[in-house]
Amino acid sequence: NKYCNIKCSKVAHTVCQTGESTKPSSKNCAKVSITSVGVTEEEKKLIVDEHNRFRQKVAQGLETRGNPGPQPAASDMNNLVWNDELAYIAQVWASQCQFFVHDKCRNTAQYQVGQNIAYSASTAAYPGVVKLIVLWENEVKDFNYNTGITKENFAKVGHYTQVVWAKTKEVGCGSIKYIEKGMKSHYLVCNYGPAGNVLGAQIYEIK
């Protein structure tokens, strides 16, 4: 497939490694009971709207949390749009059931691609996509804009910084919902183009 021509520092592309199917991996997914694969049209809209709502909140200087807060306003925040190719690659990876592991090569011909992963489970109902994105947003509480992202703080704030990375233009996500130990579980993989979280770069320009 065409993704076998896209290389990332000597690692084969996810879609080259796994094949082009978005069906759950029979080997890895056997340990859970999968109930749905993929994002609905409604979920796509919710994902884009929630990213842009939060990006605008930060851009307008309305995010009071931080270490220290508030976060400075931004002058260069792009509005995100959905990208089906990013979503497809994210879905191929989500369907591998390699929970909480980032794939090594997810780029497209157009973009270096970043990634956020989230998981939540409940006995009552499957947690929605907005709830999962809010988990990423909440990392702002540990973020110091002046320090930016470093190897030291990346694990604590890296999801937040990708959500609000100003130069990112497009997002696409894959999802699987499954039952594990009686819990209704939702696993979300979002891919971003162009990628954020470039060490040493500013997450956005201050207004």
UniProtKB/Swiss-Prot annotation:
One matching Pfam family: CAP
Modified residues (Phosphotyrosine): 111
Reported modifications of this chain: Glycosylated.
Ranges of residues in domain SCP: 49-192
Domain of life: Eukaryota
UniProt keyword terms in alphabetical order: Allergen, Disulfide bond, Glycation, Glycoprotein, Phosphoprotein, Secreted
A GO cellular component annotation in the UniProt record: extracellular region
Cited PROSITE patterns: CRISP_1 (PS01009), CRISP_2 (PS01010)
Cysteines joined through disulfide linkages: 4-16, 8-105, 29-97, 173-190
Places the protein is found: Secreted
Coiled-coil region list: none
Chief subcellular location: secreted
Tissue specificity remark: Expressed by the venom gland.
Keyword Secreted: yes
Gene3D superfamilies in the record: CAP
Residues the record marks as carrying a glycan: 141
Further remarks about this protein from its record: On the 2D-gel the determined pI of this protein is: 9.7, its MW is: 26.5 kDa.
Similarity comment: family membership: Belongs to the CRISP family. Venom allergen 5-like subfamily.
PANTHER family linked to this entry: CYSTEINE-RICH SECRETORY PROTEIN-RELATED
UniProt protein name: Venom allergen 5
Lineage of the species this protein comes from: Eukaryota, Metazoa, Ecdysozoa, Arthropoda, Hexapoda
